[in-house]
């Protein structure tokens, strides 16, 4: 039996809508994505194999939402939203079901194939980036994200963008992927968010000196770099730039 036939037949025997269900199972085994009680959003969820797996893993206390332009046949324990994942109206429907802060966002989307590899790769990266941007709008701090993309020259840039927002990112190729497939999965763990926003005016204590001579302040565990400030000072600052891991601020008390 071929590799393809094994997972196809296995999915039929075990009641999954697609062989892709086993890809999510492996991603979950390796990166611990799905837990009892978690909220999960699947982008591009039709026909629903990943929804079935997610529903099994989060159980009755969890929430699973599938989003797709196509109608998704009912899956036990799953709510579905028909719409474009990039539309704010669609995101609002997701939030109404899953809450404002989702634990996990996954996407197994693939573009309509042209047979021209460079085109298919570019379209795949575009879809993955749209899924990533949607995930940033709905994920909770500490949340996880997994997305399919075709290997190629643009993957590294996409991965770097994702790495900027999460504690770490792994590249995985599940056993259930076809031997001829170029698909890989980027699995990002631990969404990072800043406790401050641009324009905030706050009082901070300078606790260290950075390599460039700037003062270093901490807001919770978040680092702010403050020029013209010395260790031991308590100063009022305005936040001027915010990144996931650190930010910059200017003194307002001089």
Regions of interest found by a model, annotated:
Residues 1-254:
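SAM-dependent transferase fold signal centered on methyltransferase-like domains
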